[in-house]
């Protein structure tokens, strides 16, 4: 069960088609596994369609959407429906079946990375897969810009809590952390960065000029 979700504004931007392709992929992967957020987006899609038909020039504040979504969240859960037949996910189409067999490049300590930015031509963000070995620690770092991350496999923990598979995380310049992979398997994440991270450890910070 996912515990960390995109905020209302991000879901609104996704529903409106305003997110970049890499950010939209992160949302789509989360929605595939999160009925709660999927229901919210379905509602936003329906509201958007009505607004386009009846009042295309009327702007609606985020607080109104939050109020509507809160009402939906408070309603009793609907009866479960039969699961749809298995289909190839957006992730499988992009990277194949086995994430562990990708051509990972060892970076620092327990961290391996794979830059897949070239799969999103015309986009300004850096799109990176990161693998943290089971029980391993990532170097302490902060961010020079915004970083959107979704957990694809395993889990990691930092001072903000534990982030499990399909959890959605957004960090910025004010956030500094040192993730640790928890559980028995490697933790693999997909991150979209507007700028490189900034290492903050006593010795690792010397490597910052070489990070691109």
Where are these regions (language model features)?
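Conserved short histidine dyad/triad with adjacent acidic residue
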Residues: 113-119, 123-143, 172-176, 210
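Ligand-binding loop in jelly-roll beta-barrel domains
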Residues: 175-199
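Short acidic-glycine-tyrosine-enriched beta hairpin
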Residues: 158-178
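Short beta-strand His + acidic residue motifs that chelate non-heme Fe in jelly-roll/DSBH
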Residues: 41, 138-141, 159, 177-183
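Short Cys/His-rich Zn2+-coordinating modules
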Residues: 12-22
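Positively biased amphipathic helices and basic secretion/translocation or surface-docking motifs
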Residues: 1-9, 22-23, 32-35, 46-100
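Glycine- and acidic-residue-biased ligand/ion/polar-headgroup-sensing regions
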Residues: 133-136, 142-158
